A protein has these predicted regions:
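Bacterial Sec-dependent N-terminal signal peptides
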Residues: 1-32, 516
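Transmembrane beta-strands of outer-membrane beta-barrel pores
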Residues: 48-56, 87, 104-108, 125-127, ...
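Signature for the C-terminal beta-barrel architecture of outer-membrane proteins
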Residues: 168-364, 428, 446-450
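Outer membrane beta-barrel
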Residues: 99-191, 211-230
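Outer-membrane beta-barrel pore domains
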Residues: 278-291, 296-516
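Transmembrane beta-strand segments of Gram-negative outer membrane beta-barrel proteins
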Residues: 28-79, 90-102, 182-188
């Protein structure tokens, strides 16, 4: 069913325009690890990994949220080479500096391929940044280290090539004396072509606000992510049974007029030769995102971060008719400790994900089918992986025996199986991070999920996935080793134990420490 995205976008975009008009704004992007590089020069990273599993497939927590770099088929070898350069002084807020990077990952298995998760050039000035290319990103208010995955953009798929202007972190507004800080971005991108879709583009923007000075013990966060797929061509749409309804001879609107409607999705565009019937009664493109809120509390020797991400794909989501669909989380983080204990617990995270409401069961405003769109036949995916939460699954990734016995999982639109079909779920996720022997990092993840068949039947599918990862096992100098074990059991991904051994070397090709 083509998504229904109506005039409630007006309120969102009024807020965005008011905030983006402030000169000190720019990009919002929350990366898995914050960029703290303060050394000019060129650094490198080289890795070799070997992976195996008991059933020949990658366990859930071996492949998920890895930016599409871990293959599905095991055994496999994975080789990674990355180079990052910094020219200039990041500490001098009033002078621009240049950053560039590239990372190439090779998968050697029964379906060998090369992956390019990063390739970018960025110019930065203070909190602001303009970049062209791909960068590893996670969007939204979430604990990036131990999360199950941000609901709309999780770091699960290979990054999308973009041109982006924005901030790298929260930029304080001077006239508020640091009370209010803003993190925002605006970008245009290009999806990789698939068998089904060609020349599809990305529109993305976000605005987030922090209320509270950095020294305060309590700070509030709120904001919105808005993403849209638009433009492109599909032969399947041109030849399909409802082709005239869904496209103009296979083409989806890509003109300047269409772009304005994507950026400012208010009302319908009206009749035009480039618009199909569905375009004239709906919003142009596939719109989705999340409305986030967070609370950061500083304790005596620790901190708490509470956060929520409310998913939306149309008017019903923007008006919270699908509440409580989304993600809810809490993170406990230990303060600085000089303890010499063998085991130092650094962080705990717990999350709850639910998509059971779906705005009800009645059409036209209910039955939200997350990450599906009638015109964009691959759904909210990129290079074969879901862009949002990996808790949802693609039809192509499910066992064929499961698809044969479930009308829900094998449902179709215009005689095609839905690309993302397993999206009615409740999950509990926990994560822990500790330091062992004052140098070895240990990360434990566990996710229990129950998948439903919405109103098709009372059948449910339970799933448990776990992983333990050890890194910084020093071998010699700049060479260290990592070990990861992951296990799946349940009705979706049956019993599977996998292991990954990684040898990593890092260092500088050139190095020039910068002055404060």
């Amino acid at each position: 069913m083509v998504k229904r995205q109506q005039s409630l976008f007006r309120a969102i975009h009024l807020v965005c325009i008011q905030l983006v008009g402030i000169p000190s704004l720019a990009q919002f992007q929350n990366r898995p690890t914050y960029d703290t590089t303060m050394t000019a020069g060129i650094r490198y990273r080289a890795e070799l990994s070997g992976v195996v599993s008991t059933n020949g497939r990658s366990p859930f927590w071996m492949r998920s949220n890895q930016f599409g770099t871990v293959p599905w088929q095991f055994p496999a070898g994975i080789g990674t080479v990355g180079v990052t350069g910094l020219w200039g002084n990041p500490r001098q807020a009033h002078k621009p500096y240049l950053k560039a990077g590239i990372e190439v990952v090779g998968n050697l298995n029964s379906a060998s391929r090369l992956v390019l998760p990063e390739a970018y050039v960025a110019v930065r000035l203070g909190h602001g940044e303009l970049y062209i290319g791909r960068q590893k990103e996670i969007h939204g208010l979430v604990d990036t280290l131990l999360t199950s995955g941000s609901i709309a953009w999780s770091g699960n798929a290979v990054p999308i090539t973009q041109i982006r202007l924005g901030t790298r972190d929260f930029a304080p507004l001077k006239f508020t004396k640091g009370l209010i800080a803003v993190n925002a971005f605006f970008s245009h991108g290009w999806f990789s072509d698939t068998d089904s879709m060609h020349n599809v583009m990305l529109h993305a923007k976000a605005v987030f606000v922090r209320v509270g000075k950095p020294t305060w013990k309590v700070r509030f966060y709120g904001g919105i992510n808005h993403f849209a797929q638009w433009g492109g061509y599909s032969k399947a749409l041109a030849d399909g049974p409802v082709s005239k309804f869904l496209s103009a001879n296979g083409y989806l609107p890509s003109s300047l007029k269409a772009y304005k409607s994507v950026v400012w999705p208010i009302g319908q565009p009206g009749s035009d030769d480039q618009f199909s019937a569905i375009d004239t009664i709906n919003q142009i493109g596939n719109h989705l995102g999340s409305i986030d809120a967070g609370l950061d509390i500083q304790l005596k020797n620790a901190s708490l971060f509470l956060y929520s991400q409310h998913i939306f794909e149309d008017n019903s989501g923007l008006t919270f008719k699908n509440f409580p669909d989304g993600l809810f989380g809490v993170r406990w983080k230990a303060g600085v400790s000089n303890s010499g204990a063998v085991v130092q617990l650094k962080q705990l995270t717990a999350e709850f994900i639910t998509t059971r409401n779906r705005s009800g069961t009645k059409l036209p405003y209910g039955r939200d089918d997350y990450f599906f769109h009638g015109q964009y036949l691959d759904g909210w995916t990129h290079q074969g992986a879901i862009i949002g939460t990996p808790i949802f699954t693609r039809t192509a990734d499910l066992p064929s025996a499961l698809l044969k016995k479930s009308a829900w999982l094998s449902r179709s639109f215009a005689y095609r199986l839905l690309p993302v079909n397993n999206n009615d779920v409740q999950s509990v996720h926990v994560g822990a991070y500790a330091v062992l022997f004052q140098r070895v990092s240990a990360v434990l993840l566990a996710t229990g999920s129950r998948y439903y068949e919405f109103d098709y039947s009372a059948r449910t599918y339970d799933q448990l996935s776990m992983s333990l990862e050890l890194t910084n096992l020093v071998l010699s100098g700049s060479v260290n080793m990592g070990l990861k074990l992951a296990y799946d059991t349940g009705a979706i991904f049956t019993g599977n134990l996998g292991g990954m051994l990684t040898i990593r070397k890092t260092g500088f090709l050139t190095q020039k420490p910068v002055n404060r």
